[in-house]
Design a protein with these regions (language model features):
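Patatin-like phospholipase
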Residues: 1-68, 100-113, 158, 162-171
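Mg2+-dependent phosphoryl-transfer enzymes with acidic/Ser/Thr/Gly-rich catalytic loops
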Residues: 183-191
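ATP/nucleoside-binding phosphotransfer catalytic cores, i.e., glycine-rich phosphate-binding loops
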Residues: 194
């Protein structure tokens, strides 16, 4: 059984969404929502950015999909023996926050929404009243966190094309962007090349 091999998973950004489908053992759900339903519902695009100030249709992704269109099995997730951690970036501290939630489905949605909130093109999301953005800003591959937590053998699943190499870019953030969150601005300045917009 998978739980005998992988006692804990960590999901970041879109990986947090995919990880939830894995944790509920809904085989094919992540592929169906990311490929098949994208073609049908076109939930990514400039029309959403112009209409809702969000490049992704979060209402569709985090309400309609899990509740109606592609029902998510919360109970299977809550009952799974493995631990599941979702990573966000805390706008106040500019550091990663690591969340485990296996009781409250609304909080699960708040966390995965925050983990998937890309900077610049998605609004800030809130978890427990704290402003959050995409976990990939500061910990896109949380391998060190897993090692720190005592997991010596780790498997990393990346969504990169073969041969991908990160470019070093010196990108300046305009002064009006996230001006209320100086620590977030610092984090974005350090790691902007890791964000996939």
């Amino acid at each position: 059984a998978a739980s005998d091999v992988y006692k804990r998973q960590i999901g970041v950004s879109a990986g947090a969404c995919n990880g939830l489908s894995y944790m509920s053992r809904q085989r094919g759900r992540a592929k169906y929502s990311n490929i098949d339903l994208l073609e049908k519902y076109h939930y990514i695009g400039l029309k959403h950015l112009l209409k809702k100030r969000n490049i992704l249709d979060f209402d569709l992704l985090f309400t309609e999909f899990p509740e109606h269109i592609l029902p998510y099995d919360y109970q299977a997730y809550f009952d799974s023996p493995e631990r599941y951690v979702m990573v966000t970036t805390n706008c106040l501290t500019g550091e990663a926050d690591y969340f485990e939630e296996k009781k409250d489905k609304n909080r699960v949605i708040d966390i995965v929404r925050a983990s998937s909130s890309l900077p610049f093109v998605c609004p800030i999301a809130y978890v427990d009243g704290i402003p959050m953005l995409d976990g990939g800003i500061v910990d896109s591959i949380p391998l060190q966190r897993a090692i720190h937590d005592g997991y010596r053998n780790n498997v990393v699943v990346l969504t990169r094309n073969h041969g991908y190499r990160k470019e070093n870019k010196d990108i300046r953030i305009p002064p009006f962007v996230y001006r209320k969150y100086p620590k977030m601005r610092e984090a974005l300045s350090r790691r902007l090349s890791l964000i996939h917009i």
